[in-house]
Regions:
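Cytosolic covalent-transfer regions centered on His/Cys nucleophiles
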Residues: 2-173
Length: 173
């Protein structure tokens, strides 16, 4: 079954069964953030995507500004130690994202006032509102699980985090 969205046909099955591993860039995962404040976290995560050639150097500052502008609308620190900074930007050719972890936690102005330890950054093309929302919904679904959050915080390095992502996506490792 096809569904029209912004003039593009999207397979309904693809729309509804999005996996984290469909858009998380494994090589850009940060197992221990150096950043200690909101803007620095966003910058470090965007630079991780740049470092693996998912964002052009010339777009980095504009992407950071776009993410910070989104934060001004309301914090993406959703609580329980998780934040999901996200935006749409014309530099993105497809939905991409990364994950970062902070052992010490970062004040991200989260809704529950707690420090954030897990960050899921999402960057989507401007014309992909439906898929952007589907990716946010997928992230939202998995981060509701206390075990998932704990396992991601305790995972042994990048390989451990990737293994957990694949497991939650139903990919046998």
């Amino acid at each position: 079954m096809d569904r029209k969205h912004n003039g593009k046909a999207i397979l309904l099955e693809e729309f509804c069964s999005m996996k984290l591993t469909d858009f998380i860039v494994e090589d850009a995962i940060i197992t221990e953030l150096k950043a200690t404040d909101k803007e620095s976290v966003i910058k470090e995560m965007v630079c991780a995507l740049k470092d693996v050639q998912k964002i052009n150097s010339k777009d980095v500052e504009n992407v950071i500004k776009s993410l910070m502008k989104r934060e001004e609308l309301g914090s993406t620190g959703i609580g329980k130690g998780v934040a999901v900074p996200h935006t749409k930007h014309d530099c993105a050719k497809k939905i991409i994202g990364t994950i970062a972890r902070s052992t010490q936690g970062v004040d991200f102005n989260a809704l529950d006032g707690e420090s954030v330890h897990l960050f899921f950054l999402l960057l989507s093309p401007n014309d992909s509102a439906g898929l952007h929302l589907a990716a946010l919904e997928r992230i939202s679904t998995v981060i509701r699980d206390n075990d998932f959050r704990r396992f991601m915080r305790e995972a042994n390095g990048k390989a451990g985090m990737i293994e957990i992502l694949k497991e939650v996506d139903g990919i046998h490792v």
